Structures are given as structure tokens and as C-alpha cells.
Amino acid sequence: MAATTAALSGATMSTAFAPKTPPMTAALPTNVGRALFGLKSSASRGRVTAMAAYKVTLVTPEGKQELECPDDVYILDAAEEAGIDLPYSCRAGSCSSCAGKVTSGSVNQDDGSFLDDDQIKEGWVLTCVAYPTGDVTIETHKEEELTA
């Protein structure tokens, strides 16, 4: 292999040992802190808070299915990520396609607009806008029962 010489602004440099292609660098995922350490960062001055994950039990027509769901992930999204098929349509809490009934535990579904306060007190939940606030059990596929 013959070495080549390049002149750059009057300086001479040998390229015999220079790699022909630039080295590849692996980019770290942006959520590496959360994934490895159970932490999430806040946009305000680098504060870090602990992230909780709860056990969500879904009672589906196929039977009970359990998954871990972080407190900042919608239950529908966590279920899909775990390979559990749940009904949905709008993904915004403005319809009843993903309706379920909480039989134990609690959720935060402040992002939704379809359910009224009485329905929420009765245990109705829209999984597309519900975050777990503790371990929770939800009966899914309840749209027909809700709208009856």
C-alpha cells in the first residue's frame, strides 16, 4: 500500500494511517437515564425526580394480562408496547372506544374530556389518557356498557 501525502495550507501530512471511512459513533438513546436508573429529568434547572412504575392488570376478553406501566405513560401505550391489543380510536380522551372500568386501584385521566365526573366516580376510565397512580386493575372492552 502506497502512502499518499496531502498538503494543507503549507503543512504536509501523511495519510498512510488515516482511516478510509470516518469512525462510527453510537448515539445514546435520549431516555437512557430513565431506562437504566428509574429517573426522569425536569426541564427546570436540571432537577431529577424518581419515576414510579405500577402493576396494571387488564381483564380482557382473552383473560387477565399484567404489565408494568410507568406513571408518565398512558396505560393504552404501555399495553400496546407489551403486545396487548386494546380497542382505541381518537387517542385523545374525546371518544369512548378505549373505555374500561377500574375495579381496584386508581388512575389519573385529567387529559380526557369525554367522561363526566359521575362516570369517573363510578370507575369508568379511558385507557388512552389514563396514567396509573398506583397498582390498578381495569376491565377493558367496555364501550358498549358505558354508552348503553
Swiss-Prot record:
PROSITE patterns: 2FE2S_FER_1, 2FE2S_FER_2
Any one GO MF annotation of this record: metal ion binding
GO CC annotation: chloroplast stroma
Signal sequence bounds: none
Single GO biological process annotation from the record: electron transport chain
2Fe-2S ferredoxin-type domain location: 54-144
Coiled-coil boundaries: none
Main subcellular location of this protein, as a coarse class: plastid
One matching Pfam family: Fer2
Keywords annotated in UniProt: 2Fe-2S, Chloroplast, Electron transport, Iron, Iron-sulfur, Metal-binding, Plastid, Transit peptide, Transport
Bound cofactor: record note: Binds 1 [2Fe-2S] cluster.
Presequence range in chain numbering: 1-51
UniProt xrefs under NCBIfam families: fdx_plant
Role according to the record: Ferredoxins are iron-sulfur proteins that transfer electrons in a wide variety of metabolic reactions.
Homology family: Belongs to the 2Fe2S plant-type ferredoxin family.
Name of the molecule in the record: Ferredoxin-1, chloroplastic
Organism encoding this protein: Mesembryanthemum crystallinum (Common ice plant)
Taxonomic lineage: Eukaryota, Viridiplantae, Streptophyta, Embryophyta, Tracheophyta
